[in-house]
Amino acid sequence: KAGRDYSYPAIVKMAERATPFRRFVNPDDPRFANPPSMTEAIKAYCRETGQPEPVEDDEFIRCIFESLAFRYKEVLALLSEMAPFPIRKLHVIGGGSMNNLLNQFTANVINMPVVAGPSEATAIGNCMVQARAAGLVADRWEMRRLINSFLSPAVFLPEGSGEWEEAFRKYKSVTSKK
C-alpha cells in the first residue's frame, strides 16, 4: 500500500544487506494479521518493546525474515515435544520453499537441515491422490518415490549456529514482553 513494488530477488538482496539481529517481532501477534499498514504495525511493535524502529525497507524485510525463522524454531520445538519420533530436518513446501534466504535463516536457527520444495506441492499432491484413486500408484511410499524421481529439493545446512542461538535468546526476550 506504500506504493513500492519490488521483485522477490530484490527483496532478498535488500534483506541480505541489512544489519542482522537489530529488531524482532512475533509474527503471530494479532496486530500483524491484516493491519492497515504493516510498516506502521512493525514500528509500533518495536517501539513498545524498546527496540530501534526500522526506517529503510531493507530493515523491515530483514526483521520479518529473521522473526519468521525464529518463530519456526519455537513451533518446531512444540512439534518435537508431541512427535513420537525425533525430528531431524524440516521440509518447507509451497511458495515459501523458493525463498532461499529465509530457508537458510531457518536452517541456521533450528540447527538442522531444511529441505525446500516442491513449490507446487498442492498441485503435485492433488495429482498423486488422483493417481492413487485411479490405481496408478499403490501407496504413499510409491507416490513419494515418483515425486522424488523428477524433483530435486534444495537442501540448506546450518551455518553460524552460535550467533543465531544468541540472537534467538534476544528474540525470546523481546517477544516475551508482549
Predicted segments with their positions:
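Active-site core segments that coordinate phosphate-bearing ligands/cofactors
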Residues: 1-89, 98-122, 128-178
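Glycine- and other small-residue-rich loops at beta-strand/loop junctions that grip anionic moieties
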Residues: 95
